[in-house]
């Protein structure tokens, strides 16, 4: 089949070249128009349900809202995890779906089940779906800063809420624009309870009067002078004077009682659950990308829009960018594009040096851009964008892509040399040249195609990875496969034609190249010794494999190396119960300390949540975005690790457990596992006190484990409560029900939202409550006056007990089970070792209570899942490769020889990992898988040469004329005379990978871990090909000869 394709391609070479030209034009257009991003979309399919229950404590929100929602959502088809968050006034439910679920199908299913549960929620409470986005979609953040001093935080927040937000939401693929920080303007009706009692007016009557005085009505239309006039009755509240003139009732003598008579009306700030800080408090905005859309295009559109809006801003107000993901995208793409260009140049130089013939080198080099075009065309149809991983797949394939072309060119050189040697007086005419080139291609084409197919199939385990790891490495596996498949196709279709056109003139003999002479001079005596002592050679090889046991015990494990995104996120863990004022003070202190580090350019602090369903952060949760200066402006010798270490030593405040993480990586981890730290432990149970006790024990144990930099367990019961325990019997004596007292507590103490004003497009809430002096202590609450239905005036203490207690400040559930999370940050030690010691310490020192369970999460959970899948799929892939080898060689022994020799190629990779201080991870595992495919290819090519050499010696196939000397000569001929193509393949692969290994730009952390085992393996893989396979093949032939005899 392969022979037929080669011959038909040569016969129709004009059509093939036209097809290649069309492919190159199409591919170039695709490369220019391929969308780009920093990383693949790693987010799980997620649907968020947000429910507001204003003024309610977390336990009430959990019991009445979150629990009904989470238990119902467990039955949604395809849902794998349901997480619930109950906090003051809000419920968040995150439904995570299985891989491959269509996001809009998932939203429709959740909406369907939401309709079923709506009737179980409290009256007036409505659950709604969040945007079709996730926390990973926070692609651009900005702050509104007033330089003039004329605009307060309320003005800036109004500008953000009612102007900028709506303008930015018009941009295509912007799912939401969230506001954070500042203060929301609020009309506050502060009731004087004594005046209220004096006039005999209840709170319910005040609420009714406010509602009745804030309406508009239409009166249809009338005709006047042949024109239609629409009638309306204006009644919206718009000024404080409007509030003052609201009539509550008329006195006995007909004098009206106004709202101003019983209350003070003022404009003030709404209760704050989020604070933003940028050299002082500011108002921030977050642009959230719709799932699966092009981040770079949307950010460019946002910047253009903000630029046009600047002229519309009030005098002195500026928009300051605080986070811009497009900077990372540009750095990553520029870095890898540069590495690809470096690889192309280095590979071209290597080819020219070995072949010593410019036109022959061009044949090999031309396969690189053509293979790249093929890869990008397939990427376009699959919908893959250009990112660190997809470009990385092409980058690690560059060296292997030219392997087939190199072997074909070298074989063509040999056959042309032989023809000249056999016909010294003849001139090679055009027809004969094409015959020699075609025959040379057919000779090695099938084996090369099989070897490239093996390299392609070696990536099957990567395709089977699930979840986040699958989405991360899938694009790399796809693009590498497309590039190698393109190279295989070019090797049998285009390369023979290019050789026919370009390999002309005098072909320099291999011996004329000083580099080739040196290789043969070194290899020749070593191979003689190997063939003389084949068993000793194999024994030494086996012992060398055993040497990897030492570095394997020294090399740690991790899920992925930390990617330098250029920005940092400071997310300290704090204990609950902090006030808004204290949170703002803490934020300003930490931001000031962070700014003292010279490499920091800007600090944008946030504590609490943004106004979006994608952010469920409680008030005590700090997220500070740190923009670093360009690396060339850093102090000499500074690295990201050193900056983090200096930041950690600088920011030391009581009650804070520091955590420094890349922004995108953090949001991906929190979406996938819910844990913000690299290592997390989830304690689940039914009794909150038991969960808290176990979590605190684990926190104490974790701090004793080497490598743990910080450990903090969330306190489920760390919140502070003032409980109003209603005495039903006492309330009944005054004609009051429990609901009557609760309504009073909700409205007078908590503050009731009784409507909103309409001021153009702006809407501001109206809040009704008692003065601060009547509700600032338990004693004051006990003395709150209540007007009973029988118009008696009593105090709250007459119908209820007021007590101070503790309770949950925020409740988290996983699949409807209450859960506490312990955040653990590890430094100066690999993650796997830390987790293993943690597991051992917890098993020995922590006693599980009945009904509780402990599970490790965070990146360790992802690593465990990936390892489990690879342990299953790698052996299966080796079986598939074995079958291919058998089909190629038709001998079980020869297929076994190549498969069994692959571990020797891994020796160099493991030693280089140890030498460079890299940990085993999914990235290094990908490098080892790629190395195994290349090592198998080396074995195939060497075995092909050895078989050809033996087949060319008829005496070896006859038991009567067989001799070991003849066998050695044939093996020597097949190996030594073909040392150039083998050395070239090794050189181009190493040369192609070195720019990746030495790279320092964005994304190099992952790519260098993939390249390291491949480069290390390229040191031992040639030894496998050049020495071990000839030695083993000799023993195999000797055994075969003995069996024949």
UniProtKB/Swiss-Prot annotation:
Cellular component terms per the entry's GO annotation: plasma membrane
Membrane topology per record: Multi-pass membrane protein
Keyword Membrane tagged: yes
Induction: Transcriptionally regulated by CusR in response to copper and silver ions.
Main location: membrane
Localization: Cell inner membrane
MF terms in GO: monoatomic cation transmembrane transporter activity; xenobiotic transmembrane transporter activity
Domain of life: Bacteria
InterPro entries: AcrB_DN_DC_subdom (IPR027463), Acrflvin-R (IPR001036), CusA-like (IPR004763)
Annotated S-S bridges: none
Keywords: Cell inner membrane, Cell membrane, Copper, Copper transport, Ion transport, Membrane, Transmembrane, Transmembrane helix, Transport
Residues annotated as transmembrane: 14-34, 336-356, 361-381, 388-408, 444-464, 483-503, 530-550, 869-889, 896-916, 926-946, 983-1003, 1010-1030
A Pfam family assignment: ACR_tran
Assembly behavior: The cus efflux system is composed of CusA, CusB, CusC and CusF.
Family named by the database record: Belongs to the resistance-nodulation-cell division (RND) (TC 2.A.6) family.
Function text: Part of a cation efflux system that mediates resistance to copper and silver.
The protein, known as: Cation efflux system protein CusA
Species: Escherichia coli O157:H7
């Amino acid at each position: 089949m392969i022979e037929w394709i080669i011959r038909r391609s040569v016969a129709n070479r004009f059509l093939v070249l036209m097809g290649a030209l069309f492919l190159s034009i199409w591919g170039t257009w695709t490369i220019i128009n391929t969308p780009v991003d920093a990383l693949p979309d790693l987010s799980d399919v997620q649907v968020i349900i947000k429910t507001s229950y204003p003024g309610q404590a977390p336990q009430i929100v959990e019991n009445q809202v979150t629990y009904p929602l989470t238990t119902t959502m467990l039955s949604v088809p395809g849902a794998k995890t349901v997480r619930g968050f109950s906090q003051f006034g809000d419920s968040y439910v995150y439904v995570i779906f299985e891989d491959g679920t269509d996001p809009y199908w998932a939203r429709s299913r959740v909406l369907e089940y939401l309709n079923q549960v709506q009737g179980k929620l409290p009256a007036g409470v409505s659950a709604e779906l969040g945007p079709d986005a996730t926390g990973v979609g926070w692609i651009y953040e900005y702050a509104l800063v007033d330089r003039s001093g004329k605009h307060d935080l309320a003005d800036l927040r109004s500008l953000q809420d009612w102007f900028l937000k709506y303008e930015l939401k018009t941009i295509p693929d912007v799912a939401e624009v969230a506001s954070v920080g500042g203060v929301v303007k609020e009309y506050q009706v502060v009731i004087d309870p004594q005046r209220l009692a004096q006039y005999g007016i209840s709170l319910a009557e005040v609420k009714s009067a406010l509602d009745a005085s804030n309406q508009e009505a239409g009166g249809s239309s009338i005709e006047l002078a042949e024109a239609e006039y629409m009638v309306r009755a204006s009644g919206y509240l718009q000024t404080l004077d409007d509030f003052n003139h609201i009539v509550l009732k008329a006195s006995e003598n007909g004098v009206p009682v106004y709202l101003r008579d019983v209350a003070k009306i003022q404009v003030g700030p709404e209760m704050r659950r989020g604070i933003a800080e940028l050299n002082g408090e500011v108002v921030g905005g977050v642009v959230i990308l719709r799932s699966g859309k092009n981040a770079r295009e949307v950010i460019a559109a946002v910047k253009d829009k903000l630029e046009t809006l600047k002229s519309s801003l009030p005098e002195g107000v500026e928009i300051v960018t605080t986070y811009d993901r497009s900077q990372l995208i540009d750095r990553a793409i520029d870095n890898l594009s540069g590495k690809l260009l470096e690889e192309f140049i280095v590979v071209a130089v290597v080819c020219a040096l070995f072949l010593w013939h410019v036109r022959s080198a061009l044949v090999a080099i031309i396969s690189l851009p053509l293979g790249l075009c093929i890869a990008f065309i397939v990427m376009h149809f699959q919908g893959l964008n250009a990112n660190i991983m997809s470009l990385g797949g092409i980058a690690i394939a560059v060296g292997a892509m030219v392997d087939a072309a190199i072997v074909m060119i070298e074989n063509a050189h040999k056959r042309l040399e032989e023809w000249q040697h056999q016909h010294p007086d003849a001139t090679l005419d055009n027809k004969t040249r094409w015959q020699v080139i075609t025959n040379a291609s057919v000779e090695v084409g099938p084996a090369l195609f099989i070897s490239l197919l093996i390299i392609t199939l070696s990536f099957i385990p990567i395709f089977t990875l699930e979840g986040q790891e699958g989405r991360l490495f899938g694009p790399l596996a796809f693009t590498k496969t497309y590039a190698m498949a393109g190279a295989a196709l070019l090797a049998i279709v285009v390369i023979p034609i290019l050789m026919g056109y370009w390999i002309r003139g005098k072909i320099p003999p291999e011996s004329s190249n000083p580099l080739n002479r040196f290789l043969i001079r070194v290899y020749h005596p070593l191979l003689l010794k190997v063939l003389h002592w084949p068993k000793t050679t194999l024994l030494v090889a086996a012992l060398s494999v055993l040497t990897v046991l030492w570095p394997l015990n020294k090399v740690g494990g991790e899920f992925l190396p930390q990617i330098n995104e250029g920005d940092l996120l400071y997310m300290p863990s704090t204990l609950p119960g902090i006030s808004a004022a204290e949170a703002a003070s803490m934020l300003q202190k930490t931001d000031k300390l962070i700014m003292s580090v010279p490499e920091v350019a800007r600090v944008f602090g946030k504590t609490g949540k943004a106004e979006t369903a994608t952010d469920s952060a409680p008030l005590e949760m700090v997220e500070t975005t740190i923009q670093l200066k360009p690396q060339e402006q850093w102090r000499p010798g500074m690295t990201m690790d050193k900056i983090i270490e200096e930041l950690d030593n600088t920011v030391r405040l009581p009650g804070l457990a520091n955590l420094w993480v890349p922004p995108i990586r953090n949001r991906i981890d929190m979406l996938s596992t819910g844990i913000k730290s690299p290592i997390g432990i989830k304690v689940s149970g039914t009794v909150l006190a038991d969960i808290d006790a176990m979590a605190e024990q684990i926190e104490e144990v974790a701090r004793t484990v080497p490598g743990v930099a910080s450990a903090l367990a969330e306190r489920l019961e760390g919140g502070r409560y003032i409980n109003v325990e209603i005495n039903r019997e006492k309330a009944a004596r005054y004609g009051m029900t429990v609901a009557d007292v609760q309504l009073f507590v909700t409205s007078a103490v908590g503050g009731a939202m009784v409507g909103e004003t309409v001021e153009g497009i702006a809407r501001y809430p109206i809040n009704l409550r008692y003065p601060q002096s009547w509700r600032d202590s338990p004693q004051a609450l006990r003395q709150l006056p209540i007007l009973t239905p029988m118009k008696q005036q009593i105090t709250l203490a007459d119908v209820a007990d007021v007590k101070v207690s503790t309770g949950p400040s925020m409740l988290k559930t996983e699949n409807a089970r209450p859960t506490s999370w312990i955040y653990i940050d590890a430094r100066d030690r690999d993650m796997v070792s830390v987790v293993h010691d943690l597991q051992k310490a917890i098993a020995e020192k922590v006693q599980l209570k009945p009904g509780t369970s402990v599970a490790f999460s965070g990146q360790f959970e992802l690593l465990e899942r990936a390892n489990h899948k690879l342990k299953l799929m790698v052996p299966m892939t080796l079986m598939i490769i074995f079958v291919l080898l058998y089909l190629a060689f038709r001998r079980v022994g020869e297929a076994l020889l190549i498969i069994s020799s692959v571990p020797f190629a891994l020796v160099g990779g493991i030693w280089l990992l140890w030498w460079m201080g890299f940990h085993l991870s999914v990235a290094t595992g990908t490098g080892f898988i790629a190395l195994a495919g290349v090592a198998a290819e080396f074995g195939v090519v060497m075995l092909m040469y050895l078989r050809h050499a033996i087949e060319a010696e008829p005496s070896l196939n006859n038991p009567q004329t067989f001799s070991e000397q003849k066998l050695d000569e044939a093996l020597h001929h097949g190996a030594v005379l073909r040392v150039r193509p083998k050395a070239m393949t090794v050189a181009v692969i190493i040369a192609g990978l070195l720019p990746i290994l030495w790279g320092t730009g964005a994304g190099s952390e992952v790519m260098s871990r993939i390249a390291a085992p491949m480069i290390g393996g390229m040191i031992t893989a040639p030894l496998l090909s050049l020495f071990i396979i000839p030695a083993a093949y000799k023993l195999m032939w000797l055994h075969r000869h003995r069996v024949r005899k």
